[in-house]
Structure formats: C-alpha cells, structure tokens
Amino acid sequence: MANITKKVSWSSRGDESGAPWEGTPLLNGSEQPSVSRQLSGGRSIFQIGRLSTVDLEEEITAEEDSTRGRPKEIPHNEKLLSLKYESLDYDNIENQLFLEEERRMSFMGFRCLEISRWVVCGLIGFLTGLVACCIDIVVEEMAGLKYKVIKENIVKSTEAGGLSISLILWAVLNCVFVMVGAIMVACFEPIAGGSGIPQIKCYLNGVKIPRVVRLKTLVVKVLGVMCSVVGGLAVGKEGPMIHSGAVLAAGVSQGRSTSLKKDFKMFEYFRRDTEKRDFVSAGAAAGVSAAFGAPVGGVLFSLEEGASFWNQMLTWRIFFASMISTFTLNFFLSIYHQKPGDLSSPGLINFGRFESEIMAYNLYEIPLFIAMGALGGFLGALFNVLNYWLTIFRIRYVHRPFLQVIEAMLVAAVTAAVSFTMIYFSTDCQPLGPEHTEEYPLQLFCADGEYNSMATTFFNTPERSVRSLFHSQPGTYNPLTLGLFTLTYFFLACWTYGLSVSAGVFIPSLLIGAAWGRLCGILLASITSSGSIWADPGKYALIGAAAQLGGIVRMTLSLTVIMVEATGNVTYGLPIMLVLMTAKIVGDYFQEGLYDIHIKLQSVPFLHWEAPGTSHWLTAREVMSSPVTCLNRIEKVGTIVDILSDTSTNHNGFPVVVKVSDNDEPAKLCGLILRSQLIVLLKHKVFVELARSRLNQRKLQLKDFRDAYPRFPPIQSIHVSQDERECMMDLTEFMNPTPYTVPQDTSLPRVFKLFRALGLRHLVVADDENRVVGLVTRKDLARYHLGKHGLEELHLAQT
C-alpha cells in the first residue's frame, strides 16, 4: 500500500477552511470593506492602490502581539495566490530511461542536437520577422485607407459645413475594427488579450499559463493587434510581438502542432519543458528585436524580464534569433517599400537617426534629464495606480464577453470623439513646408499652405506620431497643443490598457513621454536668454519618452539598450540609463510596475530573483506542505489510480519510498515521480504481471513520454479494469532517483535560491534519516511577501 496519510489541500490551510466568503472578490464581485476603510482614512491615492500592504496595526490583539515574529497574514479577501496555476518541469528527470538514452548517443549525435538548436533559433527569428512584417504592412495599408477616407470626408464637410458626419464616420470605422478584434479575444481566446508580456514573464519564470503558447493564441494575437491599431486605440503593436515570438518559438521547437494534430517528426528531443523554455526565451527576444530593431536589447529583455536559466551558448543562440528576426523584417520591408536591399527599417517602429551634431547634449543638462526621469516615475506610478483600480473594476463587473466587446467599442468611439474634438478646437496652424513628411496632414480651418498641428498627433498611427515628436523642426508644435495632447492621451492610454483586445503599452508610453518631454524643451528654451542651448526640443522628447516608459514598465538595462539601438546614437546611453534608473526608483516608491501589478491581480505564484528580506528565520519545516502522499517503489495500480483521481488534492509530484523493515518505521526516500509520468505508465499498461506474461512486449522509451507531451491525458480518460487494479507497477526505472532534498532546518532564503535557480517544481524536505517529512512547491515559496509591515503571508485558494 502507498504511504498515504491525510492529504494536504491548499484550500484547507489555516483560516481558509470552508469560510463562507472564500474566493477572491476580484472574481466574484463581493465587497471589500478594507478598501473603504483605507479610503476613509485619508490615504494618498498611491497608498490606496497597495492592497498587499494594508494597515493591520489597529487589528493586533494581545494574543497576536505575543507572536509578532510570525509573518502577518494579509486578509483573505484582499490578496490571494490561485491554485489553478501549476508549475513547469524545468528540472530534467534523470531516470534510467534518460541515462540510457544519453549513454547511447554518440559524439555526432550531440553535435547534431546542437546544430538542431541553432536551426530552430534561426527558424524562430525568420518566422517572427515575417509575422512582424505582415503586421506592419497590413496596419500601414488599412490605416492609410482609413485616414484617407476620413480626410476626404473632412475636406468635403469643411467646405459644405456639417463636420458631424466626419465625426460619426471616424467613430464608426474605429468601432468596426475594434469590435472585430475584441470579439476574437473575448469570445475565442481571452489569453491573447493585452500585450502578453506578463504571461510570457510567468511562463519563463516556471508557471504554466493555460493556452499561452498555442497556435490559436498566435492567430488571435496577430489579427487582434492589427484591428486594435487600425481601430485608432491608444495602443502599439510592439508589445504583442514579444508574445507572438514566444508562441512561434514554442510551436517550431516541438516539430508538430497539437492544435492542428499534425506531427512533422522533427525535433522530438526538444519535447520537454527545459528545452521549450530556452526556445521561448529566444522567441521573446526575437519579438523585441523585430519590434524595435534592437537585437542586443532583445537578448537583455529576455534575461532581465523572464529567463530563469542562462548560459553562454543560450546567449549566443538567442542573439542569433534576434539578428535573424530584425534582418528578415528589414529585408521584406525593403521589398514592400520598393527599395530591395535598402535595409533601413530594422524594426516596426523607426525612431529615426539622432545625429550627435544636431542633437548634442551638454553635461549641465544631465541634472535636468534626471529631474525628467523623476517626473516620468511619478507619472508612471499614477498611470499604474489608475490602471490598477480600473482593472479591479473590470474583473468584478466587466467579465462577460458581451460586456468586454461593448467596453472596447465604447473606448474606440470615445477615442475618436476626443481626437476629433481636440483637432476641431485647435488653432495651432503650421506652415506646410517642403520638409513636411506627414502623410495625412489636415488643413481643416487653417489657411492655404498650412496644416493643423494637433492632427499630426491624433490623426495618425502612434508610431508616426512618435517620430514626428522626435524629429519635427522647432516651432512645429506650440505648448498648448502638447499639453492638451499629453493630458488626453494619458487617460486614453490608461483606459485602453486592459481591454479585451490585443495591444501593447510601449508606444502609448513613448508617445505620452515624447509629448511632455518636447513641452519641457520648449519651456526651457523660452525661459532662458540663449535659446540656442536648448535649440532642439527633439532630444527632450526622447528623454521624456524614456522616462515615461520606464516609469510605467520599470525596466532598466534592456530598455536602455533598446532605446540606444532604436535611436542609433550611443552617446545618449548615459542620460537614458540615468533617466530610467531614476524613473524606476521614484515609481517603485509609490507603486509596482504595470506588468507586476497585472501578474499579482491574476494571483500567479511568481517567484522573484531573491527571497523576501527578513525571512532568514523561517525554515523549510515551516513553509513546507505536510503530510506528504508517497508511493512505494513497487506500488499497487489501484492505489495509484485512486491517488491520481483524488480531486481534492490534485498533487503533481510524489516522493517514492522504500521500506527498510517490516515494522512501522517510516519509509526512506528513494526517488520522485510526476503525475504526468504515472499517466503515461497507466496508459501503456506498464504492470509487473503483464511484463512477465508478454516477454516480447516493447519496452517503454522516452519517446513515449515525449509523444504525450505537453497535453497529457487526464486520469479519467484512462480505463483500468478491476483485474488491472490488482496488478503492481514497478517505478524504479521511471522515477528520478536523485531528487533535490533539503534538511528541515534549511532557511527560507537558501530553499528559495535552490528552488529558483534550478527551476524546480518539487523540493523534498527530509530528516536526518532521509525520511520524507514534507514537500516544498512554488506556491509554498510564493506565499511569502515583503510588505511595508514586514514579512506577510498570502492566502491560497481555488479561484
């Protein structure tokens, strides 16, 4: 019989046992009294947004005061870790099958595997660049057609009167495109909504996000982002490219499509989480490279934002994929622009060249840049707080697909109405000189030979607007135009992010920052006697764009390199780095980064690089799950089926033990086996009795496990007869005989470092006699969080 004691149910921990209010209010719409308490307490808007650090001092009793050493528990209805997320197996299972396969492989076999990895990375880069090219061409053509139709209508309506028809036309066109994109996301593949960067960060961190790298997700993501950008929303197409690259990498590296049920019999060796993770890292980097024309920035993004494992060869392969991606995009866009071989469009967004002679900066301007970084951090924190509360509202009340589509169409209509109103009432007319490069200039009420400057920002794709703010001549925009645009676009972008559409936040952030950055440059020139010092406001637009984007997403290293590569001027590396560091420091003081906020709102058990501070006094004994369900090395089939069928626990890893004597002494650890392995063994009827009676039966190989990967069948789909339940199963050949273990007194930071660095899914806690006393999983470690009141413990519940 299995060594089965009381099985641990995550939802039965502590005070979570059957509470009538169990479950997250973010999902079921229940009240949050603690929020109203904070509001009435007169806190600042930034402190209100930090539900994870709610003030608990007024609730401490004398009994609780005696146990101040324990981590405080955040109230259940405010912060949760969801049980619906499982971990990925980033640790190789070195069982007998694995070792035999490695032993049989020759030197040439290993060389062929290494070559295959490079080939896959090249394919990932090529396909990512090709997808980016398709997105860019479709958006350019459809947006160009839309704006030309609207422009012709505005010209006719201006002459005849009645511009309301133009407003209605603009709003209707926006709504139609956005409706199509929102229906695809809300009704067919919700995981394709947003930029996808938080989901890919979680995947690379080791969290299994359902449906995140499926073919259907890619199709909806690509078509959806086309509709979102053409629909005029305050979004960008660059963020979703990272998700698209990751999906392409996950599909290509497996040599088959489970969605299409097509197996190409290629790259079968890579059908495991460890290999797939490395290729997804390459896909994410290729997506960044295609988006910004920044291959080095793509590598650093993959390292900074997600990769849980890194080595030198992986760095080279990821860089190779990034270079292939940007070259592919560059090459095909040169053909599209009828300039074959003119490789001047390395990314979806082209910032243009920032020539050192024209846009040079002086040493005494660096303090001004740092001050702009602080302003960007503050505005980024404000953006994140507002989006945080808006997301909570959406989770509570806008959770039906119909409502999600209606909201997206409402935002599209409001965006069109606001844009039209701002252009209509703007009196900022600029001369239409020979150097003017805008494709859709609007004259409206301006004199002949002039155009409406406000229309340059609103009546355009976001990428063109950013480039205009960077490189337009001084005097192109007046301060009022830039101020009004910054204010309106800030709130439009905040409202838009989180809709059920495929969209990114990179370009809106750059656009907002470029607008107020250019405004700062104009104001500096106006208040100084020597205007030549601040002659070009374009450099302040660049600094403002970096500050705003850094204040929202809180990336430093990778974003610095991305901006430097996109501008083509390495001399701006130092000020951009200082600006991004300042924006992150200031922003983190008020609120977390936007991606981290959305990860927490989804209750994902995300593990950061380091364990929470002040946690050294906690040990493995206090954080582990116990008692543990164990299996004997030779176990009864019926017992295994019963354990796997137990929906109250749904464990995925089982220590394998062996009895050293016939007395009641606890059994000793001899290995670890996963649920997925047991499923395959049951499916192939790998029973001791059948093996004896069928001497010519084919021996189970690793290929059988790889063929079942990644969608292992549920236990309910496997038929086991009553006679088969009485058979025995020998796990010796299939279990991992050398699982990682720690003593009970190991400190939490050491457990965390081992778990995080090695990409583990299960960590066995054993006593001095090597007997199993507990099991540490991702959720055990993610429960502990450092808040402003010290170490806090999150709740675990089925959401």
Please report, for each region that a protein language model flagged, where it lies by residue.
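Alpha-helical transmembrane segments and immediately membrane-proximal extracytoplasmic
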Residues: 2-662, 668-721, 727-736, 763-764, ...
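Structured, soluble regulatory/oligomerization domains located on the cytosolic or IMS-facing side
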Residues: 741, 746-760
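C-terminal intrinsically disordered, low-complexity extensions immediately downstream
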Residues: 754, 791, 797-799
